[in-house]
């Protein structure tokens, strides 16, 4: 049976960094470890497969060979010859076989810094009006002693003796030769003989930094703000990554947001619903009076234009929609109960056609339903 791709086994991309590979291995190894799956032959085989993939992909030389030749690189006779740091043969065949096998004569560039993500919780008011907030994030910053070179102060990285600074080595097999990343310097073309005492040759140190982030008015949950160059510092002077601030708007006790519109429920008593009147309602800009017409039914929506959220992209301003909820009175006194009884009598009972047309229609429908059943 053909062996599975090592990258596929670990669930990582072919450009994955070593820390991504280690993280994937740790997760899968814990899941399929024999101690946690005693007697499970399938899990045992899976664990061996994961371990094999990890051992190859975390070894720079083995990984480079695997990327070039696949599983054939580790079969007997799969790779002959050895490493050669010269450049003459590459001048003849490099353009042809470099393209075919993914090699190339250029030195591998130092890795750009990783992007970072920060989850920011905002109140609805902050999201609507905009706000400036200070955040503190852990990150990797350029070492201030070696200025990112990784070398001890007063020294410089030295040219790699294996690849002579090209970052590439040649694998010979018979008449043909292919290039791959130098396993000695990992493609950088230089080596650090005396590492910096502070960053230990990495060119970066762990730090926390404080940033002032300006949140524009109108943002909503799911919006993302990019701060260029505020991610982790790049390796050995490479560009820094970016910081992405992910917005999450907290639930509001009064308003619900849908796009640029706001919704709220406005409770009114049945007397106001029947007779009409004015009631004070909240908006994000303060209190305003809402005119309720007579004979208003529960669920009726009243639109207050321009009282919603201004679009984060400018221009459009949303509305505030007030949904009326007619409340049934509670805690009635005997006098109030009698007044309601008298009122109900004046309606002609609970199904009064004139004053409760929907009730009349409903009960007429119920009567017809049962009449049809008894026929």
Swiss-Prot record:
Induction: By heat shock. Binds 2 Zn(2+) ions per monomer. It comes from the Bacteria. Keywords: Chaperone, Cytoplasm, DNA replication, Metal-binding, Repeat, Stress response, Zinc, Zinc-finger. A zinc finger (CR-type) spans 130-208. InterPro entries: DnaJ, DnaJ_C, DnaJ_domain, DnaJ_domain_CS, HSP40/DnaJ_pept-bd, HSP_DnaJ_Cys-rich_dom, HSP_DnaJ_Cys-rich_dom_sf, J_dom_sf. GO terms for cellular component: cytoplasm. Its cofactor is Zn(2+). It holds the Pfam family DnaJ. Zn(2+) 2 binds at residues 160, 163, 182, 185. Zn(2+) 1 binds at residues 143, 146, 196, 199. GO terms for biological process: chaperone cofactor-dependent protein refolding; DNA replication; protein refolding; response to heat. The keyword Kinase does not apply. Homodimer. Participates actively in the response to hyperosmotic and heat shock by preventing the aggregation of stress-denatured proteins and by disaggregating proteins, also in an autonomous, DnaK-independent fashion. Unfolded proteins bind initially to DnaJ; upon interaction with the DnaJ-bound protein, DnaK hydrolyzes its bound ATP, resulting in the formation of a stable complex. GrpE releases ADP from DnaK; ATP binding to DnaK triggers the release of the substrate protein, thus completing the reaction cycle. The J domain is necessary and sufficient to stimulate DnaK ATPase activity. Zinc center 1 plays an important role in the autonomous, DnaK-independent chaperone activity of DnaJ. Zinc center 2 is essential for interaction with DnaK and for DnaJ activity. Belongs to the DnaJ family. This is Chaperone protein DnaJ. The lineage of its organism: Bacteria, Pseudomonadati, Pseudomonadota, Gammaproteobacteria, Enterobacterales.
